[in-house]
Amino acid sequence: MSSRKSKSNSLIHTECLSQVQRILRERFCRQSPHSNLFGVQVQYKHLSELLKRTALHGESNSVLIIGPRGSGKTMLINHALKELMEIEEVSENVLQVHLNGLLQINDKIALKEITRQLNLENVVGDKVFGSFAENLSFLLEALKKGDRTSSCPVIFILDEFDLFAHHKNQTLLYNLFDISQSAQTPIAVIGLTCRLDILELLEKRVKSRFSHRQIHLMNSFGFPQYVKIFKEQLSLPAEFPDKVFAEKWNENVQYLSEDRSVQEVLQKHFNISKNLRSLHMLLMLALNRVTASHPFMTAVDLMEASQLCSMDSKANIVHGLSVLEICLIIAMKHLNDIYEEEPFNFQMVYNEFQKFVQRKAHSVYNFEKPVVMKAFEHLQQLELIKPMERTSGNSQREYQLMKLLLDNTQIMNALQKYPNCPTDVRQWATSSLSWL
Amino acid sequence: MAHYPTRLKTRKTYSWVGRPLLDRKLHYQTYREMCVKTEGCSTEIHIQIGQFVLIEGDDDENPYVAKLLELFEDDSDPPPKKRARVQWFVRFCEVPACKRHLLGRKPGAQEIFWYDYPACDSNINAETIIGLVRVIPLAPKDVVPTNLKNEKTLFVKLSWNEKKFRPLSSELFAELNKPQESAAKCQKPVRAKSKSAESPSWTPAEHVAKRIESRHSASKSRQTPTHPLTPRARKRLELGNLGNPQMSQQTSCASLDSPGRIKRKVAFSEITSPSKRSQPDKLQTLSPALKAPEKTRETGLSYTEDDKKASPEHRIILRTRIAASKTIDIREERTLTPISGGQRSSVVPSVILKPENIKKRDAKEAKAQNEATSTPHRIRRKSSVLTMNRIRQQLRFLGNSKSDQEEKEILPAAEISDSSSDEEEASTPPLPRRAPRTVSRNLRSSLKSSLHTLTKVPKKSLKPRTPRCAAPQIRSRSLAAQEPASVLEEARLRLHVSAVPESLPCREQEFQDIYNFVESKLLDHTGGCMYISGVPGTGKTATVHEVIRCLQQAAQANDVPPFQYIEVNGMKLTEPHQVYVQILQKLTGQKATANHAAELLAKQFCTRGSPQETTVLLVDELDLLWTHKQDIMYNLFDWPTHKEARLVVLAIANTMDLPERIMMNRVSSRLGLTRMCFQPYTYSQLQQILRSRLKHLKAFEDDAIQLVARKVAALSGDARRCLDICRRATEICEFSQQKPDSPGLVTIAHSMEAVDEMFSSSYITAIKNSSVLEQSFLRAILAEFRRSGLEEATFQQIYSQHVALCRMEGLPYPTMSETMAVCSHLGSCRLLLVEPSRNDLLLRVRLNVSQDDVLYALKDE
C-alpha cells in the first residue's frame, strides 16, 4: 500500500514538475512583459509619461534608452507600451513601428518595413512596391501631411539603434528626428542601444535634431536585490494549479536563498556580471537537474550549474587532444618562453618536438613528419593556434608563422586534469630543460 | 444659400477702364479697373483692384470668392486675353471633407477662409468674374454672425492653408480692412449724390428686401454657362454699392472700439436682412459633397459621355476652375431649351449664343484692347513703388467716380430687367445643385493657353487638391488630441521646436539681408545664388522659410511679382541625382528618371522660352549633393546665370568654407560671393528666444531661463537644444510637484537637473555600476598601461594582470572565458575599444575613457 502511495505521489510530481519546468523556462528564455520591473521606476515613469504625451497630446518626442546588454531596455519599453495600450483612448489611436538594426541593415529595407508596418497606400498584400527614392518621398509626404491634433501618433522603436547610425548619410535618422522636431505627424522615436558613446555616432545635423533625452539603465542594484531577484525568478506564481506543490517549491526556494553555499554561488555570479541573462542561464542549468526522483532544487545543483557556467572553454578543448597534440602545444609554449612571444612556424615546433623525443622520452612514439603536420593542422582548425595575418600568402605551410592562443597558466591547468598524461610529458611541460 | 446667377443667357463684354500701366519687366499691361457690360440691358459694373469679387466655378450656388489684386492683359498669344490675379478665399464646403473637422466648430453660414496656400494659382481669366461681394474681416475674438440674413456679405475670420485653420494675422486683417475703407472714402460723395437721385422712399431696408427677393428667385434659376452679367447681377451690384459705404463705415468704427463691436454688427445685420433663411437650405449646403456624384449624373445631360471619354489630360483640365468655354456655352443652351420651355419668350433677356455672336464679341474685345494705350515703360524699383502707388490711387479715385455716375444713369433699366428675370426664374423648376468645387488649384498655371479651347465642364467631384492621385497619409486619429490643461503643459507645447513662432527673434538682420536679396532678384527678373552657412540649430532654414512666407504675402499684395517656391533637402534624398527628380516634380508635376529630369530642367532653365514667373529654389543640406563630378552643384549654380532662367537659388549648409573646401573652381565661381553666415546664438539671444516663446506665460523663473541660455550658449549655441532642455525642465518640475494642481514654477534647480541629464557623460556612472570583475578588469588595464607605458595592450597581457589582481583581492580565480566575457561586455558599452574577438588572446584593448575618469570612478566606492 505504501509503495502504491509513493508511486501515485511520484506521478503527481512528474506532472507538476513538467509544468514547473515549462513555466520557469518560459520565464528564463522569453522576456515576457509580465515579469516585474525592479529598480527602474524613475526611468519607467519618464518613458511612460513621454509616450502618453505623444499618444494623448500629439507631442513629438525622441529618446534614447541606453544600458548594457541584459539591463532590461526591451523589457522597459515593452512594459511601457503595454501599459499605454491599456488606456482606452490610446489603443486605437497609436501606430507602432518596430525596427531592429540587425534586421533592417540599410535604409532601403528599413523604409519598406516602415511602410509595411504603417500599412500605407503603396502596400499591396505584404509587399512594398516602388524604388528606394519613391518610397522615401512617399513616406515623407505621408508623414508631412499630418499635423499635431488630427493625425494618429506613430511610435518608432529602433532596437540596436547604433547600427542605424551606420547607414549611409543617416538618412533615416535625420528624417525621423526632423519630423519629430517639426509640425508634422506626431511621432515618438525611441532608440535602444547599449553603446554609451551613441551621441558621438550621430552626425551633427542629426544630433542637433535629436532631443538629447537619454534614459540610462545601469543595473544599479546591489547583492541583496540580486538574491531577491533570484528568489522572484525561481518562485512559482500563485495561480499554479497544484497549490501544495507550489507552496513546497516556494518554501524550498526561500530556504535556498538563505543557504550559505548558494549565496556564495550567487555572489560569484554577481561579481562576474550583473546581467540578468547570466542568472537565467544559471537557473536554467540548475532547473534541468530537477527530476521526479529529485523534485526540489538543492544547493548542489546550483553549484554544479555554476561550475558549468564558469568553465574555461579552451581548457575543455585541450582535454580532448591526443598526446601528440599536447606535445606540440608544450613545444610551442617553450618556444614562446624562449623567443618572448614571437611567432613560430611548423618547422620550429617540429624541431622542438624532435629534441624532446630523441633525448629523453620513450613513452612518446617518434611520429613521422606528415603525421605531426596533420596534428599541427588539427590544432589550427581548433583555433588553438592562429596564423599571422600578413604571411597567409604563398609561403609553404611548414614555414607559415603562427601564434599560440593559449596562455601558459591555461596549459598547465589543462595538463593537471588531462587524463592519462605520460609523466615525462608532464615533466617536460614544467621545464624545457627537464631532460638534462 | 443664394444662387448666384453666373451664366445667364446674355453675354457680357469686358473692357478695361482707365489707361493701362505698362510694365516692361512684367511683359504685360496692368489696369486699375474693369468694366463689365451686359448685352441687352446696357448696364455696367465697374470692378476695381482691391475689391472682393465672385468668380464663377463649377458650383453655381457657391461661386468662388476672391480679392482682386491685379488686372492685366496677357498678350503672349495672338488673341490678347484679359487676366486677373486674385487672392482666393475658400468656403467651408470647398475645404476637403476630411479636413473639415479641423475647424473644431460649426462654421458660420457665410464664413469664408483666407486661402493661404501659395501653390494655388491665383492667375485667372478676368472674364470669369461674376460680380462684387462684400467681405468683412473679423478679429480673432469676434464671433461669426450666424443667423445673419444678409447673404451678400461674407465673413472672414480664419485662414486655411490646406493643413490648419489659423487666425488671420494682424497685418492681413488690417490689409483686408483697408481697401474697403478706402473704397468707402471714394464713394462717399457719390453715394450722397446717387441717393438724392433715387426716389426718396428707397430706404436701405427696402433695397435689401428687393435684393433678397431677387436672390430667392435666383436660387431657383438654372444657371447657364455664359459670361455676361445679368440684369440681376447688375442690380445686386448696385445695391451692394449702396450698402457698402455704410457697412464699411460701420466696420471701421467698430474696429476702433472692440467691446461694442459684435453688438453693433448684429444690429446692423438685422436691419438689412428682414427675411429669414430657411434651415433646410443650410443643411443642403453642408452636405453637398456627399450628394455630389449622383447629382452630377443627373445634371450631366449631354456631356456625361464626353466626360467618360476624356483622357487623363482632359481630366486635369476638368478640375481647373475656369470659365466654361464658348462651345460649351452653346451646347448647354441647347440642352436647356426643353427645360425652360415654359418660359415666356418675351421676357427672356438671354441671347442664345451663336458662332456669329462669338466672333462679334471677339472682335469687340480686340478693339478694346487696341484702344488701350501704352504708357511709358516703368522700371519697377523699390524707390518707384511709392510713387506708383500714389498714381494708382489717383486713378482708382477717378475711375470710381466715373463709374458711379454711369450706374446712376442706368438704374431704371436695371429694375425692369430685374423683375422680368425674376418671373422667368420662378417658372423654371429648381435644379439640383452642382458638385462643390474640388479643384486642384495648382494646375491652373499650366493651362493658360487652353482656357478658351477646352470643351468640358468640371464635374468630377472630390478630387484631392494635390496632383497626385494616391495621397499618402497617416491614418487620422479617431479621438482628438488633448489640449494642454496646465500652464506647464502649455509652456511645453510652446517650447517644442516644431511650434512655429510668429516672428524669429534675433535673426532680424539675416532676415532682412535674405529678403532684400530675393526681393531684388524678383523685381529685376534676374536669377542669382546665395550661400547660407551656420552650425545646426541657428535658424537658417527657419529664417529662409520666414522670408519666403513674407515674400509670398508681398506677392499676394502685389508688391513683388509672383514667384514659385521649391524646396529640396539633400538629406531627404536617397541619392544626389534624385534632386533633379524632386525639382522637376515640384516645378511641373512631371515624374521622370534622374537623367531625364536633368535634361528637362536644363531645357526649361537654359532655353529662351515663354516668360514665366521666377522660381525660388531652396537647397537645404547642400553638402549632401556632392558627387565626384560635382555636376549637380554645377548645374544648380549654373542655371541662375542664364538670363531666361529667372531662378534664385538659396543654398544652405553647415560649413562656412564649403565652396572652398569641396567645390571645384568652376562650381564655386558660379556660386558667387553672396554668402551669409549664421553665427551661433549668444546667451542673451537664446534668452530672448525663450522669453518670446513664453510670452504671457508664467512658467519659468527668470534665472532658470538664464541658466539654460548660458549653458547652451557656452556649449553649442543651438536653439533646439535650448528649447529641449526647457521642455525637459518643465517635466522635471511636474514630476517633483506633489500636488498636480498647484501652479508650479520651473526653478533653477529643475533646469540644472535637465541640463545635467542632457549633457553629463554617463561613463562614470556606468563604471560605478559595473560588476566587481569588470571593475577589476579596468584596474588591470590601468596597471598594464602603467607597466608598459603605452595606451594599448593585448588581452593576454591584461589577463595576467587581472589574475594577479584577483588573487590579491581574494576573488576566485577568473577563467579565461569569464574574463573574455567581461572584456567584450565592456567593449559593447564602449567603455573599452576592442578589436573583433576572433583575435582572441591577441586582441588589442584601449580605454575609451580617460584614465583619470576610470580612477575617479573606481576610487569613489
UniProtKB/Swiss-Prot annotation, chain A:
Keyword annotations: ATP-binding, Disease variant, DNA replication, DNA-binding, Dwarfism, Methylation, Nucleotide-binding, Nucleus
N6-methyllysine sites (modified residues): 7
Record: residues binding ATP: 67-74
Gene Ontology molecular functions: ATP binding; ATP hydrolysis activity; DNA replication origin binding; nucleotide binding
GO cellular component term, pick one: nucleolus
Pfam families in alphabetical order: AAA_16, ORC4_C
InterPro entries named in the record: AAA+_ATPase, AAA_16, ORC4, ORC4_C, P-loop_NTPase
Any one GO BP annotation for this protein: DNA replication initiation
Annotated compartments: Nucleus
Disease entry from the Swiss-Prot or TrEMBL record: Meier-Gorlin syndrome 2: A syndrome characterized by bilateral microtia, aplasia/hypoplasia of the patellae, and severe intrauterine and postnatal growth retardation with short stature and poor weight gain. Additional clinical findings include anomalies of cranial sutures, microcephaly, apparently low-set and simple ears, microstomia, full lips, highly arched or cleft palate, micrognathia, genitourinary tract anomalies, and various skeletal anomalies.
Annotated function: Component of the origin recognition complex (ORC) that binds origins of replication. DNA-binding is ATP-dependent. The specific DNA sequences that define origins of replication have not been identified yet. ORC is required to assemble the pre-replication complex necessary to initiate DNA replication. Binds histone H3 and H4 trimethylation marks H3K9me3, H3K27me3 and H4K20me3.
Family, per entry: Belongs to the ORC4 family.
Subunit composition and interactions: Component of ORC, a complex composed of at least 6 subunits: ORC1, ORC2, ORC3, ORC4, ORC5 and ORC6. ORC is regulated in a cell-cycle dependent manner. It is sequentially assembled at the exit from anaphase of mitosis and disassembled as cells enter S phase. Interacts with DBF4. Interacts with POLQ.
Protein's recorded name: Origin recognition complex subunit 4
Organism from which the protein derives: Homo sapiens (Human)
UniProtKB/Swiss-Prot annotation, chain B:
Domain BAH: from-to ranges: 45-171
Sequence positions that bind Mg(2+): 620-621
PTM note: Phosphorylated during mitosis.
Compositionally skewed regions (Basic residues) per UniProt: 457-466
Involvement in disorder: Meier-Gorlin syndrome 1: A syndrome characterized by bilateral microtia, aplasia/hypoplasia of the patellae, and severe intrauterine and postnatal growth retardation with short stature and poor weight gain. Additional clinical findings include anomalies of cranial sutures, microcephaly, apparently low-set and simple ears, microstomia, full lips, highly arched or cleft palate, micrognathia, genitourinary tract anomalies, and various skeletal anomalies.
Known partners and oligomeric status: Component of ORC, a complex composed of at least 6 subunits: ORC1, ORC2, ORC3, ORC4, ORC5 and ORC6. ORC is regulated in a cell-cycle dependent manner. It is sequentially assembled at the exit from anaphase of mitosis and disassembled as cells enter S phase. Interacts with CDC6 and KAT7/HBO1. Interacts with LRWD1 predominantly during the G1 phase and with less affinity during mitosis, when phosphorylated.
Domain comment, as recorded: The BAH domain mediates binding to dimethylated histone H4 'Lys-20' (H4K20me2), which is enriched at replication origins.
Protein name as annotated: Origin recognition complex subunit 1
Organism: Homo sapiens
